[in-house]
Amino acid sequence: MALSREDVLNAIAEMSVMDIVELISEMEEKFGVTAAAAVAAAPAAAAAGAAAAEEKDEFDVILASFGDKKVGVIKAVREATGLGLKEAKELVEGAPAPIKEGANKVEAEELKKKLEEAGATVELK
């Protein structure tokens, strides 16, 4: 008498975790397959994508908007970039605009913090 799929699933459902692990190992040996390969492929790909995002070492600091404290933001931009008053004002008024390109993570975070303290909305890309 052949077992139906439902019978097999019911039998597996009644097994302990250790018995299921042993069953999987025996099935891998008997049929020459690996159960973990298909399951691990998706998380590995996701982890690789996450690792690539974490490893980004150059950031562009983008001034999204200057909010209601335009003068303070202009001063912060001048201090950060060394631009003159006119150039900094044009840069701020032209938001969204890049403030610094290719900055390392620490430098980009510090610049973002300074600009946000001055009232700006800043993005790191």
From Swiss-Prot:
Sorted UniProt keywords: Ribonucleoprotein, Ribosomal protein
Gene Ontology biological-process entries: translation
Record-annotated membrane-spanning stretches: none
Gene3D superfamilies: 3.30.1390.10, Single helix bin (1.20.5.710)
Claim: Ribosomal protein is one of the keywords in the record: yes
Single GO molecular function: mRNA binding
InterPro entries named among the record's database cross-references: Ribosomal_bL12, Ribosomal_bL12_C, Ribosomal_bL12_C/ClpS-like, Ribosomal_bL12_oligo, Ribosomal_bL12_oligo_N_sf
Cellular component, GO annotation: cytosolic large ribosomal subunit
Coiled coil region boundaries: none
CDD domains: Ribosomal_L7_L12
Segment forming the signal sequence: none
Function: Forms part of the ribosomal stalk which helps the ribosome interact with GTP-bound translation factors. Is thus essential for accurate translation.
Xref: PANTHER family: 39S RIBOSOMAL PROTEIN L12 (PTHR45987), LARGE RIBOSOMAL SUBUNIT PROTEIN BL12M (PTHR45987:SF4)
Subunit organization: Homodimer. Part of the ribosomal stalk of the 50S ribosomal subunit. Forms a multimeric L10(L12)X complex, where L10 forms an elongated spine to which 2 to 4 L12 dimers bind in a sequential fashion. Binds GTP-bound translation factors.
UniProt family annotation: Belongs to the bacterial ribosomal protein bL12 family.
Descriptive protein name: Large ribosomal subunit protein bL12
Organism whose genome encodes this protein: Psychrobacter sp. (strain PRwf-1)
Gene name, Swiss-Prot/TrEMBL: rplL
